[in-house]
């Protein structure tokens, strides 16, 4: 299979055709090899218009959803970004090509280690991974110019909102354990939060102290 052709087709038919306009983001998705972040047996499906299982009851998000959430962050290249839910590492790889520094938190050790290997393979040295409860964030590195959460939460965790810089944007799926709304939060100078509902979505649930408490 020619992955370069598959990746180009993915961007043209799934990303650009659905209204994603950020040129830097489009270039990043043309550049980052998504198949590196899935199991070898599923590499041929890596550029399909669907989420894929990556083990540990987790998934790699649909390419369009990765693009949409990233575009909502409005990255210019100078930002420090926090990602909650490293998963396969693909979203972190996209962020790493668009921002200055990426801090990503994954609670499942095998996924974090596998993601680290994939990111290292691509030479993405501006990504820092922490194995921890993502709903707590990464307080010692706060504040962040942008925060992206790749799992569905019952509400926006206060801990994450607190770690968002003034003028920063937080993108997160919010709802029940089966269906959510993609939400963008922008922090104002007075510390207040402006909330925008973007679109319906469906993510695995955000497990942790300030999310869904358990996997059950």
From Swiss-Prot:
Single GO MF annotation: protein-L-isoaspartate (D-aspartate) O-methyltransferase activity
Keyword annotations: Cytoplasm, Methyltransferase, S-adenosyl-L-methionine, Transferase
SUPFAM superfamilies the record matches: S-adenosyl-L-methionine-dependent methyltransferases
Reaction(s) this enzyme catalyzes, per UniProt: [protein]-L-isoaspartate + S-adenosyl-L-methionine = [protein]-L-isoaspartate alpha-methyl ester + S-adenosyl-L-homocysteine
S-adenosyl-L-methionine keyword on record: yes
Annotated HAMAP family: PIMT
Record family assignment: Belongs to the methyltransferase superfamily. L-isoaspartyl/D-aspartyl protein methyltransferase family.
PANTHER family: PROTEIN-L-ISOASPARTATE O-METHYLTRANSFERASE (PTHR11579), PROTEIN-L-ISOASPARTATE(D-ASPARTATE) O-METHYLTRANSFERASE (PTHR11579:SF0)
Species of the source: Geobacter metallireducens (strain ATCC 53774 / DSM 7210 / GS-15)
GO biological process, alphabetically ordered: methylation; protein modification process; protein repair
Function: Catalyzes the methyl esterification of L-isoaspartyl residues in peptides and proteins that result from spontaneous decomposition of normal L-aspartyl and L-asparaginyl residues. It plays a role in the repair and/or degradation of damaged proteins.
EC number(s) recorded for this UniProt protein: 2.1.1.77
Signal sequence annotation: none
Name of the top EC class for this enzyme: transferase
Listed GO CC annotations: cytoplasm
NCBIfam families referenced in this protein's UniProt entry, alphabetically: pimt (TIGR00080), PRK00312.1 (NF001453)
Subcellular location: Cytoplasm
Active site per database record: 61
Protein name per its UniProtKB record: Protein-L-isoaspartate O-methyltransferase
């Amino acid at each position: 299979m020619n992955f370069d052709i598959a990746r180009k087709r993915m961007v043209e038919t799934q990303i650009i055709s659905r209204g994603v306009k950020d040129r830097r983001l489009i270039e990043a998705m043309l550049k980052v090899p998504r198949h590196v972040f899935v199991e070898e047996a599923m590499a041929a499906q890596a550029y399909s218009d669907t989420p894929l299982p990556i083990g540990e009851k987790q998934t790699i998000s649909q390419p369009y959803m990765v693009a949409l959430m990233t575009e909502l962050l409005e990255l210019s290249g100078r930002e420090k970004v926090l990602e909650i839910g490293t998963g396969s590492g693909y979203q972190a790889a996209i962020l790493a090509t668009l921002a200055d520094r990426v801090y990503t938190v994954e609670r499942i050790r095998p996924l974090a280690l596998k993601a680290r290997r994939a990111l290292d393979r691509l030479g993405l040295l501006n990504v820092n991974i922490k194995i921890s409860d993502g709903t707590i964030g990464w307080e010692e590195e706060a504040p962040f110019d942008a925060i992206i959460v790749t799992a569905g939460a019952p509400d926006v965790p206060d801990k994450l909102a607190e770690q968002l810089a003034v003028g920063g944007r937080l993108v997160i799926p919010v709802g029940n354990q089966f269906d959510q709304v993609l939400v963008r939060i922008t922090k104002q100078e007075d510390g207040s939060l402006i909330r925008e509902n973007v679109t319906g979505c469906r993510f695995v649930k955000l497990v942790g102290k300030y999310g869904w408490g358990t996997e059950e």
